[in-house]
């Protein structure tokens, strides 16, 4: 049985950390990004997760990469696919981005074993 795709608008630790500073940004993230954009029918949540992980790796956004890697796994992206994504993008976004992403992803994978 495949996992139920997730785009939970529930508070995340990252969003909670800055909610008091940018409450409107968090509100827009939860209502528009996760409540609307992620719910559009044109792409599956799995595909959106794969695209988002790729974009975050390419833009060198390790803080956001962790949470979206967890979401991608919950949405059915496999560990092998994430590894292939990192390897493939190394040639387009650079070796440093790929190596940093690999470290973040390794932490996520290890956290799921516990």
Ranges and model annotations:
Residues 55-61, 90-94:
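Short alpha-helix boundary/capping elements
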